[in-house]
Amino acid sequence: MNIVYALTSNFVELARPSMRSLLEHNPKAKIYLLTETDTVETDIPMTVINVSGQTYFNDRNCVNIRNNFGGYINLLKVCYPELLKLNKVIHLDADTIVCDSLEPMWKTDLKGKWIGAVQEKQGHYKPFGPVYYNMGVAVLNLQQMRNDNAVPQMVEYLKAVRQPFADQDAWHKFGLPDKFVDIPLRYNENFATGKTDDPAIVHYCGISDWYYNPRMERREYLEKYR
């Protein structure tokens, strides 16, 4: 099972609880960290990949790159198929806690598809059609994306159009309607997707100062691994 995080080095500490919880429930998982340095001080076994020299978004004069909401590392999420010579990965945001085995999620049948993810609830942001998926947790078929030459299309799109959710919007622009597969809600419980009685992944997206917020719902999951 391949798990990937894309973070600037100053955010790695915030992701440590996510990684600890992942390995407790999935001890054989292999973690890849895409960041802007060669080394990261951590006690968690991982493969660190320095993406600072990549040329995909090196045009600093491009206003849509310079002012991107999520920054350079966030933009590079769409380049996973080229940066990671793997067939398949699970992407996790830093603000997640894993509460169970991810094997069933990992085994999602993505034949011919790009992405397995959880849909956000009706009424949320949907600029590309009737559905929108939360990409903070996603199973990604990197080999199929390479077969479909997806990366150049998404990179050029993000250079030309500044979208509020960058990588997430690019995946939807080119992946809808037929490149997504629905996975169960329990693999990405958050304010946008809904709640479940048996979460496998709790995702604290949309919560102000989530790492320190004492009134945050499901805080007990985070506290266990801090």
Ranges and model annotations:
Residues 1-17, 33, 135, 140-226:
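A glycosyltransferase accessory/donor-loop signature
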Residues 2-4, 30-33, 47, 90:
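A structural signal for isolated positions on well-ordered beta-strands in alpha/beta enzyme cores
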Residues 21-29:
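Short, acidic, metal-binding catalytic loop of nucleotide-sugar glycosyltransferases
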Residues 35-40, 102, 121, 186-189:
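Short, polar loop motifs at secondary-structure junctions
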Residues 41-83:
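Active-site-proximal specificity loops/subdomain of glycosyltransferases
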